[in-house]
Amino acid sequence: MTSELEALRQETEQLKNQIREARKAAADTTLAMATANVEPVGRIQMRTRRTLRGHLAKIYAMHWASDSRNLVSASQDGKLIVWDGYTTNKVHAIPLRSSWVMTCAYAPSGNYVACGGLDNICSIYSLKTREGNVRVSRELPGHTGYLSCCRFIDDNQIVTSSGDMTCALWNIETGNQITSFGGHTGDVMSLSLAPDMRTFVSGACDASAKLFDIRDGICKQTFTGHESDINAITYFPNGFAFATGSDDATCRLFDIRADQEIGMYSHDNIICGITSVAFSKSGRLLLGGYDDFNCNVWDVLKQERAGVLAGHDNRVSCLGVTEDGMAVATGSWDSFLKIWN
């Protein structure tokens, strides 16, 4: 039995090496070579324009609404707060049944928010009830591990990722799981929907990223390269690439059509993990939230650091860029959200 396993192990290693060689052969240029004639973006300096105060404990997640004005945040204080980013007013403060919340999401329509965490359940809240109060409109049980990330496709469909090593597509109306997406060999920490909503990418503690087709439920591609857990993942605005952030202190850029890693964003001085990543609207800048309380801004094409957003007194746990590209929000364990531009 052990000899059989060993033989199989060697065979998989050989196959992996063949794939690696094939990818190398297909890589006719590097990002650095291809962008040699591109001017660097220069120094990016952003200021804190708003500070959102109201949470009483660590903030774990935030997500902008598609109107680029409202945002939702989730904190260990057991509250989901919907904020008006222009006025800093709280539009809704939603007490949660479980305070161990790890993710939140705003529906594109603006009608719903969702959250979940160590309760293994994705809870959907309706913001537009006749009575004007916010209420749980649906609870989606089915994962056997914590909920790490959730994103709405529309008002009736949501995709979740979980510590049970799977992702899932749900019908919100019926509360049923439509598809389960397997293949990761570690906790799935993050997911990002493609701009066309037909695929999503996931990052996991097996240090790999996977691309799934939402319609047929199959893993189409697997991307390796990171040396530790992938905590965050986000699609490039055109849908042909995505970026990841990992505990190995690097962010990486993967090209879907080239089927491989094409860029790495790291610095000798940066030795802590990345909790969250987001692109600017054009995709030229990559923002990363770090355990060392900072948010680094990277020039995607030049693979150089272009700026730092410093202002939090604890780990930056989440960040997001508005759909109109005009602002970035950071959330932190210091219990504050900051809006920058």
UniProtKB/Swiss-Prot annotation:
Pfam families: WD40_Gbeta (PF25391). PANTHER family: GUANINE NUCLEOTIDE-BINDING PROTEIN BETA G PROTEIN BETA. G proteins are composed of 3 units, alpha, beta and gamma. GO terms for biological process: signal transduction. This is Guanine nucleotide-binding protein subunit beta. The keyword Repeat applies. Belongs to the WD repeat G protein beta family. The lineage of its organism: Eukaryota, Metazoa, Spiralia, Lophotrochozoa, Mollusca. The keyword Repeat applies. Keywords: Repeat, Transducer, WD repeat. Guanine nucleotide-binding proteins (G proteins) are involved as a modulator or transducer in various transmembrane signaling systems. The beta and gamma chains are required for the GTPase activity, for replacement of GDP by GTP, and for G protein-effector interaction. WD repeats lie at residues 54-84, 96-126, 142-171, 183-213, 225-255, 269-299, 311-341. It comes from Loligo forbesii.
